[in-house]
Regions:
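NAD(P)H dinucleotide-binding glycine-rich loop of Rossmann-like/cofactor-binding domains
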Residues: 65, 78, 90-152
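Short, well-ordered loop/turn sites that connect or cap secondary structure elements
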Residues: 85-86, 142, 230
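C-terminal hydrophobic helical "lid"/dimerization subdomain
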Residues: 270-314
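Glycine-rich beta-strand-centered segment in the early N-terminal region that forms part
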Residues: 22-39, 51-97
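Short glycine/proline-centered loop/turn elements that form peptide/ligand docking sites
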Residues: 75, 80-84, 174-183, 220-221
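Glycine-rich phosphate-binding loop and adjacent beta-alpha segment
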Residues: 220-281, 314
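Short amphipathic alpha-helix with an adjacent loop that forms part of the alpha/beta core around
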Residues: 198-208
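Mid-domain Rossmann-like dinucleotide-binding core that forms the NAD(H)/NADP(H) cofactor-binding site
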Residues: 130-195
Length: 314
């Protein structure tokens, strides 16, 4: 038996409950993984919150999409993107629907080796945010020597995007709240406080102009400023401003004509693992909660200023 978190109905974090259920025996192309840590992402509560539609048939809804752990059982022909999988392998899993669980059976195609340089908590928070960061950097085509502005640079996606870009020789300017400016600076970016006067502070930090933008905040101010700074809206990408697609900016994660980036995201783990091995990226874990505290984790993350990744410990 495994413990897992489900949403009993659509609503806020109060609809979550911790239950016990059997763990399916892995079939062909599947493995079972014992969770060591579980990544928490805004999409987790948006799904049971109804932001992406409501289907009563989906209830009770398993929650979560990524985890790190140890392979405990292997089905026939279970081969991940890095090769055949074996019992005892230390892995990162994404996508892993229902990841808020002590043990989970998943497609082998979702399972990648855990970089030994990362803790369980760090590995649990790497793949979804990291895939989004790689996806965003790829669609705007930012390259060495260019200047990149990241709105919301202190969050899980923003911090990873900043580190990856810096490792690739890109100059990064990142907006953040006052309490998170040092965290952004720590990873080689120029930190700029958001709020009144943001336009002037960004122009001062980038006297030569801004070539591309990643928006992780979704605010109207962020998109309006980005359109003012960057002549080509196709070099602006947002992971939240889904209602601004008519401006010509690129969207990932939702909205009309969003870029799915299926191949980019599926292959992103290789770049992320390589950068982790080289010491070029870290996963900043802002806070951990127990599996039973998933609702509290969601309330904290929904406040909008986590300062890194939120992780559950089974």
């Amino acid at each position: 038996m495994a413990k897992r978190v489900v949403a009993d109905s659509y609503g806020g974090p109060e609809v979550l409950s911790l239950i016990e259920s059997d763990v399916p025996v892995p079939g062909p192309g599947e493995v079972t993984v014992r969770a060591m840590a579980i990544g928490v992402n805004p999409v987790d509560y948006k799904l049971y919150g109804g932001a992406m539609g409501a289907d009563p048939a989906a209830l009770p809804m398993p929650v979560g999409l990524e985890l790190s752990g140890v392979v405990t059982a292997v089905g026939r022909d279970a081969e991940g993107p890095a090769g055949p999988l074996s019992v005892g392998d230390e892995v990162m899993v994404h996508p892993a629907p229902g990841a808020y669980a002590t043990e989970l059976t998943v497609p082998a195609s979702s399972v990648a080796p855990k970089p030994p340089e990362l803790s369980w908590e760090e590995a649990a928070g790497l793949r979804l945010a990291g895939a989004t960061a790689v996806h965003a950097l790829t669609v705007i085509g930012v390259s060495e020597g260019e200047t990149l502005l990241i709105h919301g640079a202190s969050g899980g996606v923003g911090l990873l995007a900043a580190q990856i870009a810096v490792a690739d020789g890109v100059r990064v300017i990142g907006t953040a709240g006052e309490s998170h400016l040092d965290s952004v600076e720590r990873y080689g970016a120029t930190a700029v406080r958001y709020g009144e006067g943001l336009r002037e502070r960004v122009r001062e930090a980038a006297p030569g102009g801004v070539d591309a933008v990643i928006d992780t905040s979704g605010t109207r101010e962020a998109i309006d400023l980005s359109l003012e700074l960057v002549p080509d809206p196709g070099r602006i990408v947002s992971i939240l401003a889904f209602d601004r697609g008519d401006t010509g900016i690129k969207l990932i994660g939702g909205g009309p004509n969003a870029d799915p980036g299926t191949e980019i995201r599926a292959g992103s783990w290789r770049k992320l693992a390589e950068l982790a091995h080289q010491g070029e990226i870290e996963v900043v874990v802002a806070r951990t909660y127990s599996l039973a505290e998933a609702a509290d984790a969601h309330r904290f993350l929904a406040e909008g200023h986590p300062g890194g990744k939120v992780v559950l410990l089974p």
